[in-house]
Amino acid sequence: MRSLRALVVDDSSLNRRTIAAMLGELDGVGHVDLAGDGAEALRVVEANPPDFITLDLEMPRLDGFEFLHLLMDRHPIPVIVVSGRSEKENIFRALELGAIDFLAKPHDDVAPLESLRRQLIEKVGLIRQLSPLALRGDNSGRLRLDAEPSTRAQRVREPTVLKRAPGKVVVVGASTGGPRVLVTLFRHLHDEMDAAIVIAQHMPPRFTRTFAERLDRTGVVRVSEAKQYERLARGHAYVCPGGRCVEIVPSDRGPALRVVAPDSGTHYVPSVDQLFRSAARVLGNKAIGVVLTGMGDDGADGARELSRRGGDVLIEEPETAVVAGMPLAVRRANVRHESLGIWGLGDRIAQLTRPDQG
């Protein structure tokens, strides 16, 4: 197996040395280059293209955002953002510009360096699973969420007096690459959709609320972080809180959400399997499962149960997903499903959730 070449970009010499030393100790990493800002990093990329980059965002001369914009136009290379927990908005902005994932600088951990090392081990393992096609692909995916919603979105998103129960519920699972893909998907959803959406995006605590707020600005569907026993409403999406799991439960006025601790032995949190299994139990053929990009097999067991109970299962085409693991696991589990590119997924969800499909 070929050794990976890494580039560490950070204006702090201490951070550069620390991250480089940790990467140098990992199996599979053969060489680590260093750069103190975006301009220097671009020169390194031109001279010796790395297999992946760890990137600080706040730097002099050419900051991380400008660097990402130039890099994705010239040399699409996997970028992992290294940022503090207080910089959540910046992290999601970087993901929209093309970064594939992030790791949080540990401040309050008992053993912060060990926490950082564990995250780096996970991310380096991820690099080898990335789809080259997805990395070369559509740079128009660098979507801006800072703009106000379109006129059409503003019109249909005006608050209503009554929350209508949805005809169907779309449950979505995603991991690495998910935030960017979800932005694309939500921009192509239709305002006549007779459904609610519940999203299990693998993400640590304290990040999911910011993600929900940014996703809320993308189009016609309102988005918020899921709350305990919140009743599902048509035209609304709910993001599972980081570090917790969400299950769909029955109520006297339609399906609702229960925020719970992960099941014993759950490796991925928020758990896609836990969400999908609850949707299968409560909703049966009124549930639609969607498995997007991500490492591992979370969602495969839940998709099998959902399909067994009559629900539809859609997966992002593994060949074009940033990380094929999760959708590929559904395919290998012999679950009845449809495999579509991200543009096709939006259209298919619209077809399955039309009011006349009830």
Where are these regions (language model features)?
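Conserved acid/base catalytic micro-environments in cytosolic active-site loops
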Residues: 1-7, 12-28, 34, 39-47, ...
